[in-house]
Amino acid sequence: MSDADSLSCSLTLESDEYDEEEYDTNLSKLLENKTLNWIFVGGKGGVGKTTTSCSIAVQLAKRRESVLLLSTDPAHNTSDAFNQKFTNQPTLINSFDNLYCMEIDTTYSENTAFKLNKTEFFDNIIPELLQSFPGIDEALCFAELMQSIKNMKYSVIVFDTAPTGHTLRLLAFPELLKKALGYLINLREKLKGTLNMLKSFTNNEMELEGIYEKINHLNAMSISIQSNFQNPLKTTFVCVCIPEFLSVYETERLIQELTKKNISCYNIVVNQVVFPLDSMTVDVAHCEGLLKQIKDKQVQESFSSLVQKTKELEDVYISRRKLQSKYLTQIKNLYGNDFHIVCMPQLKSEIRGLQNISNFSEMLLESKEIPIYR
């Protein structure tokens, strides 16, 4: 059975067990939670993660003493969102005195601002470690990054993450570090006698002790980071999606992985939702009656063309609503009992600039019924 078929089956099964009792359909509880230190915002590419994370940060700035919006997405759309250039250093966002933003690269690089203080001996160990634990280079860089972030004195940090696959790797780094560093610590114990003998023949005793100290420090750091990740009072994840198959599928995959890693997740933001209009249908019979009353042929043709175009637009609108309703129903059935599901409307233009972000952020506080087409 394919992954798509599996998801379809799970959706059908969940639908039969759906209870009408639901969580609030806004982010008020998230924003009012004073214990949270880290809020991760993630999902499939192109679903509005940056807009959502920026909006959450703007609302938090009204409630918390100091807020940092941190982009770990290589695309770094936060600068475009606020029309302001950000770097790998916290920069105050225009018009705020307590909201900062920074854009960092979580991939391993000699040029990264958060790199390990390496030695020649450490350089010799790393290649062996890389072969045994692929991805440990990025994990080490991530550990240094998270430790630096942890030492920053912000009330809360909002992470604008990369698309799902990259984010899942990022969240797996603490466990990878724990395994790799545990391997090194065990190796040290096994080779303790040999290493002590080597000390008497070399001048590297201080260097060896420095490396062991660094490894123990990194191990303690990875345990601390993992503990923070798994503490629902300190860390939570906000999933962002749109009502389309691939996005809903990736959201399910993301939530399953977060559950496996014991990371709290109880909010889903569904963007680009087409809500019902006040009047959804064109009264064709009435329009045809009006058409017969028009004597001027040119006006009659123009009116007829207008009615036809309106009808075509209505057909597209209804088709779009029906398609979205299929996935909104699945989202409701899968997550309605355990998540705050916030539906955000399809807007006329992209969200750029502080005013537009602020307007969007206010909508996150509004309770809106999930618009299922009947």
Curated annotation (Swiss-Prot):
The keyword ATP-binding applies. Its EC number is 3.6.-.-. Belongs to the arsA ATPase family. Keywords: ATP-binding, Cytoplasm, Endoplasmic reticulum, Hydrolase, Nucleotide-binding, Transport. It comes from the Eukaryota. It is found in: Cytoplasm; Endoplasmic reticulum. CDD domains: ArsA (cd02035). InterPro entries: Anion-transp_ATPase-like_dom, ATPase_ArsA/GET3, ATPase_ArsA/GET3_euk, P-loop_NTPase. Pfam families: ArsA_ATPase (PF02374). Homodimer. This is ATPase ASNA1 homolog. ATP binds at K44, G45, G46, V47, G48, K49, T50, T51, E244, N271. GO terms for molecular function: ATP binding; ATP hydrolysis activity. ATPase required for the post-translational delivery of tail-anchored (TA) proteins to the endoplasmic reticulum. Recognizes and selectively binds the transmembrane domain of TA proteins in the cytosol. This complex then targets to the endoplasmic reticulum by membrane-bound receptors, where the tail-anchored protein is released for insertion. This process is regulated by ATP binding and hydrolysis. ATP binding drives the homodimer towards the closed dimer state, facilitating recognition of newly synthesized TA membrane proteins. ATP hydrolysis is required for insertion. GO terms for biological process: tail-anchored membrane protein insertion into ER membrane. GO terms for cellular component: GET complex. The keyword Endoplasmic reticulum applies. The active site is at D73. SUPFAM superfamilies: P-loop containing nucleoside triphosphate hydrolases (SSF52540).
